Structure formats: C-alpha cells, structure tokens
Amino acid sequence: ALVLGGSQGNIEQVIGVGIKTRWRDEELARMQDLAERPVRWLATREEAVERYLKVSGLVGLVKEVSLCAQSGVATGDDDRYRLSTDPGIYAIGEPPVATLVSAARCQVLLAAGEHDAMAGVEDLKAIDPAATILSGLGHNAQVEDPAALWSLLSENK
C-alpha cells in the first residue's frame, strides 16, 4: 500500500496497520534463511490451511473454511498443497518504511494494535507522531475488528 501510495496520483489515502519498523539482526538473518528455503509442500489442504493460519497469526481469528483461510493456500500439480506466499518475499530484508511514508503522494495513516507485540505504536510514532493506537487489539487488528479501521479511515478523511 505504501508503494502504491507513493507512485499513484489517484490514491487519496493508505493505512498501514501493525507495520514492523524495528528489526534485530537475528530477525533479518531468519528472513534470509526463510527466503532461501524451498517451498514446503503438505499432503492435505487442511494441513496447509492450518499452517497458513499459524504463520499468519490468524489461529482463533479466522475459521479454516473461510475465504481468508483458503486463499492462503495454493494447490500443486501433484495434489499437494503449499502456502500461497512465495518464500522469496523474505529476501527483501528490512523494509524502508520511513522512506516509503515520506515519499507517499497521499495521506498515510499508521496504526498498531494496543497489544501488538511485533509492531508497537511507539515504533510507528518515530516515523509519524500521529500514529494511532487501536485499543484492545493485537497484531492482526484489521481481522480482529475491521470496523475500527473503517472508523479510523473515516475520521481522517
């Protein structure tokens, strides 16, 4: 969203929720390791959905049969299943969040759930002092309470 907000003139506003802005060296090394691993194939769709929900932090927030859960899984030619995400995405390393925010040609709202252990609002406030705390929510605030995000967007038009 931040890249689009910085490159397109027809986007008025983007919101970044729970964006991790502070990375330890060991986290960056783990990301590189993940990027270099081969795709992990699973025997059943159910196993793949379970894995997707786990790595996405969505266990207990999203039902296994939901479109959200199912969209996180891809089917191979040999009737095996994998996560839809390409492991190569982790090769990006530390995202330049501050640079992307400052380059955006639209309004950027940054927010984090009050209980987000991965991406706290204090880290976001180093980039944008107006970053918002989403009360009572965690890292997947957009799933936990979509109405809270709509409210935030509506208040900041």
Language-model-detected regions and their locations in the chain:
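Active-site loop signature of alpha/beta-hydrolase-fold enzymes
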Residues: 22-24, 118, 140
